[in-house]
Amino acid sequence: MGIKHLYQIIQENAPDAVKAGEIKNHFGRKVAIDASMSIYSFLIAVRSDGQQLTSETGETTSHLMGMFYRTLRIVDNGIKPVYVFDGAPPKLKSGELAKRFMRKSEAAEAHEEAKEVGTAEEVEKFSRRTVRVTREHNEECKKLLKLMGVPYIDAPTEAEAQCAVLARAGKVYAAASEDMDTLCFDSPILLRHLTFSEQRKEPILEIHLDRVLEGLDMDRKQFVDLCILLGCDYLDPIPKVGPNTALKLIRDHGSLEQVVEAIKSDPKKKYTIPEDWPYKEARELFFDPDVRNADHPDCDFKWEAPDVEGLVKFLVEEKAFSEDRVRNAAARLQKNLKTAQQSRLEGFFKPIAKTEQEKAVLKRKHEEKLELQKKKKKEDSKAKKEAKSKPRGTT
């Protein structure tokens, strides 16, 4: 799930933190990819009849098709991926997982009903909601990656947290995931849409945490508190507290402790804190997650030459993939993994830290930009209201 409405808040309050670009802009970089999130996205890439891709024997192959060809596209563009798989979820996440299971069970029933009486759109919608990543999906993807010569890591718990460790240590340029909570785990850079298909034509979004904090004028603790208030995998949001209210509460009070105190002491009782809302434990999971240090032997990864015959045996003989396509893809993989060894020029230079004066100038420019955005928003809203109030047919 990630963090509800966080990207919207960043867009509105720290637009300079987000850079949209093409996949080729990341040539020569190493990237840690949240495997489970990627596999989930491959599984929901269904056919028009609402069914997943399958082999002749009826086995699901969407996850393997996605992992093989999307990884190939990443390597074709000179990027060296390392995939990170989820371990056991933290205990605090069990409530969220139970809710997801219930939603999927309800969706499965609705899917069956839609197949009987619903439209094609309804069948596809409910089919997507029933999808979940199984242990078998993970194991088959690991087998495939090994045959491709692409490294992977098993995280003790959350994959995003382990990706963040690798990014902070400089072992990879960025963490890649659709989950915005990767920023809560202190990943300096988050890439979104990296494993999307080329047909979707979505730009790769590069989000810089330091610019997010600068734009929001918060330290990391306040940022994590904001994310908890917005609603995360560990806790639901406080009822009736939307994104703008959450941002205002953190800005006004500075911490969740103060926010909770203010809500409880409010005579109007505008908001109600849920009875079981362990925000301190949630915060601790973001600040001290169960991860392996970057110098741990399990985090020592390298890229190998693909096992072409192994790929043919697994994908062609066992999963009924096209042999010509698999052999051609393996040849591209072998060639491009070597090409990706080339270093980017930026790797030879260390960034120069900004002076306090430069920081102040940037902050002022950012505040001016925000004011202009607010002013434009007000003017647009006013123009819409005026247009609505005019009788039809008048100019």
From Swiss-Prot:
EC number: 3.1.-.-
Region spans: Disordered: 360-395
Residues at which Mg(2+) 2 binds: 179, 181, 233
Required cofactor names: Mg(2+)
Main location: nucleus
Example of a GO cellular component annotation carried by this entry: nucleoplasm
Domain of life where this protein originates: Eukaryota
Entry-linked Gene3D superfamilies: 5' to 3' exonuclease, C-terminal subdomain, 5'-nuclease
PROSITE patterns: XPG_1, XPG_2
Amino-acid positions noted as binding DNA in the UniProt annotation, renumbered to this chain: 47, 70, 158, 231, 233
GO biological process, any: DNA replication, removal of RNA primer
Binding site for Mg(2+) 1: 34, 86, 158, 160
CDD domains given in the database record: H3TH_FEN1-Euk, PIN_FEN1
InterPro entries xref list: 5-3_exonuclease_C_sf, Flap_endonuc, HhH2, PIN-like_dom_sf, XPG-I_dom, XPG/Rad2, XPG_CS, XPG_DNA_repair_N
Compositionally biased region (Basic and acidic residues): 360-389
Alphabetized UniProt keyword annotations: DNA damage, DNA repair, DNA replication, Endonuclease, Exonuclease, Hydrolase, Magnesium, Metal-binding, Mitochondrion, Nuclease, Nucleus, Phosphoprotein
Cofactor note: Binds 2 magnesium ions per subunit. They probably participate in the reaction catalyzed by the enzyme. May bind an additional third magnesium ion after substrate binding.
Entry's family note: Belongs to the XPG/RAD2 endonuclease family. FEN1 subfamily.
Subunit structure as annotated in this protein's UniProt entry: Interacts with PCNA. Three molecules of FEN1 bind to one PCNA trimer with each molecule binding to one PCNA monomer. PCNA stimulates the nuclease activity without altering cleavage specificity.
Function: Structure-specific nuclease with 5'-flap endonuclease and 5'-3' exonuclease activities involved in DNA replication and repair. During DNA replication, cleaves the 5'-overhanging flap structure that is generated by displacement synthesis when DNA polymerase encounters the 5'-end of a downstream Okazaki fragment. It enters the flap from the 5'-end and then tracks to cleave the flap base, leaving a nick for ligation. Also involved in the long patch base excision repair (LP-BER) pathway, by cleaving within the apurinic/apyrimidinic (AP) site-terminated flap.
Name of protein: Flap endonuclease 1
Organism: Ajellomyces capsulatus (strain H143) (Darling's disease fungus)
Gene name linked to the record: FEN1
